[in-house]
Amino acid sequence: MALPSMSVSEFDALIEQCTNEKIPNGEIDLSAALELSDMIRSRRLPPKDAMRCLKKRVLQTRNNQNLQFSVWRLVEVCMKNGGVPFLKEVCSREFMDCLEQVILAESTDYELEQFCSRLVGELYLAFKNDSQLSYVVKVYQKLVSRGIDMENLKPTENLNAMFDAKTPADWIDSDACMICSTQFTLLNRKHHCRSCGGVFCQLHSSKFIPLPDLGIFEPVRVCDNCFEDYDLKRKSSKGKKSKGKKRFTRSEDDDEDLRRAIELSLKENGRDADTFIPDTAKLEPLKKDPDEEDPDLKAAIEASLREHQQEEMRRKSQAKNMYNTSSPSVAPPIENNYDLSSNEEEDIHLFASLVERMKTQPPTAVLEDTQLQQLYQKVLGVRPKLNYALSDTVSKYNTVYEMNSKISDIMNMYDSMLEMQLRNISLSQQYAIPESGRNSYGYHQNMPQYDQPNSPQIIAQPQIHSPQQNERTILNYASPVSQHLSNGATTNTYQQGSALQNQQPAAPEPQPVSFEKPSTTSQLEGLILEEPSEPPYPDENTTIENPKIEQASERPYPDDHLKQENITSFDFPTVPLRKLSIHGSEQEVKEEPVQQEQLLIEL
C-alpha cells in the first residue's frame, strides 16, 4: 500500500494553517506543525519542494513581524523533525541566504533576530564537521564578522539528537527477493519495504503496520524482518510497563507509611481525633499505546518537550523584564552601541589639536611623538563606530523625512476636503428657498373682492401700512399693468374706498397676518381683471365727494373731450364699462372724472 502523495498547493495551505494570523504572539498550531513535519519526513512531498514552500511563506510575511516569527518557529519544528534529507535542503545556499538576509535586515525585530541567529548557531554546532553542510559554517562566520552576537550559544550533549530524526530508507533495486532469493517474474512481482527499503516477494512482504517513528501513521507494507523488530520492541515496552507498576506500588506503600507517622505524631501531641488527616489519592497507571513504546520516539518527544519548556521559561522571563521596565513598548528596545563615550570624544579632540600643532613641525618630530601614534590607533578603532552611527542617523533621517511627507500629503487632502465641504455649504445657502413671508413681487396684496360682476361691492378692511409697504404700493400703482384698467372704474373704486375709510372712526387692533408664497399667475390675473386697491396717500385735507352717476342712454362710452389727470401723461384707449344692450333700452352710466392729486415718491 503506497502512501498518497501531496501537491505543493496542499502543502502551502497547511503552512498557512500552522501560521494563521489569528494565533497571537507569533505562536503556531503545534499539532498541525508536527503533522507537517511528519509529512516531510515520510517523503509525501520532496524535501526541496517543502523547503521552497517555507521560503515562499517567509518572503510573503516579510512586512508582518508576528507572522514572520511564527513562520520561523515552524521552520525550526520541521528542521528538528523532518529528517536528514530536509536538513540538507535547509542548509543549502538557497535557504541560508534568506535566513542571513532576515538577520541582517534593519527592519527585523530584536526578538526575531535573536531567534534566527540561535537557529544558525545550533546548525553550526551540530554540523560544523560535516562536509556536506559546509555552507552553514560560512554563514556563521559571515554573521560573526558583521557583529552578530553568537557567544550566548553553548554546545549541549543532546544537540545532535535534536536533529536526528529517523526517515524512511531509500529504495533498493534488485532482481531477487532479499530473504528467499527467488527471482522476480511476471507472476512473482517485487515489493519494497517502507521501513528498510529492501526488495521482497509477496510471501515475505505481506505484513502491514503503521510506522510512527518514520512519520507514517497509516498501515504500510513491511518485510518480515522489520515486522519482527517492531514486535520485539512492543514486547520490551510491555516489560517496562510491569516494572513501572511495581515501582508505583512501592511509592504507594511509602505514602501509607507517611500517613501513619502523621497520625501517630498528632495523637502524641494531644490533638483531637476529629482533626483532618490528608488522604492520599491512589493514582491509576496511565494506559499507553503500543506505538508510543519506542525508545527513540520517546527520546525525540522528551527533547522537543524540554525545548518547548525552555522556550516558555525564556519568554516568561522576558515578559517579566518588560513589565518591570517603565517603557510601554512590547519588544525590548534595541540598545544603540554606536554612541561615543566621553573618553573617545576627548581622544578625538586631543588628536585633532595635536595634528594642528604638528603642521608647523618637521616630519621627524611627527614620527618620534609616541602620544600622537597612540591616539592615532585609538581613533582608528573609533572610526567604524562613527561610520555605523552616521549610517544609522542617515537612515533615521530618511525615515522621518518619508513620514513627514506622508503627513503633509494627508494634511493637503484633509484641507481640500474641508474646502469642498465649505464650498458646498455656501452654495446651498446661496440657492436656499427665500422666506415665505416676504413678497418677491412689488404688487399691492390688498385686492378688493367682488360678489357679482353687475353689482360690485367693495369690502374694505382696516390695514396698517409700514413705510416699506407704502413705497412698494406707490410703485406698483404706477406700473404699466395697472394702466390697462378703465378710468371710470379706477375713480369709482378710489371714491368708494376713501368713503369707507372716512366712515371708520379708529383703526382696529392689528391682527396676525399669515404669510403665503405669492403666485405670479394669480397676481397678474388679479391686477388685470380686478380693480386696484385704494391709493396709500390720499389727501387728508381734501374730502372727495361721491360723483353722481347719471344714466346715459345715448352713448355707452365716457366723454372723450374730458382729459384725466393721472400719474402719467399717456392716454390709452378706453374700454366699455358694461355690455351694450341689444334694443338700446338700457341706460348708460355717465361718470365724471375726479381730479386727483399727484403722489410723491419717497427716495
Curated annotation (Swiss-Prot):
Location in the cell: Endosome membrane
Q: Where does Zn(2+) 1 bind?
A: 177, 180, 201, 204
VHS domain spans which residues?
20-151
* Domain UIM: from-to ranges: 253-272, 292-311
**Gene Ontology biological process terms, A to Z:** protein targeting to vacuole; protein transport to vacuole involved in ubiquitin-dependent protein catabolic process via the multivesicular body sorting pathway
Q: Which GO terms describe its molecular function?
A: phosphatidylinositol-3-phosphate binding; ubiquitin binding; zinc ion binding
Q: Which family does it belong to?
A: Belongs to the VPS27 family.
Per its record, how is this protein called by name?
A: Vacuolar protein sorting-associated protein 27
Q: Which organism is the protein's source?
A: Kluyveromyces lactis (strain ATCC 8585 / CBS 2359 / DSM 70799 / NBRC 1267 / NRRL Y-1140 / WM37) (Yeast)
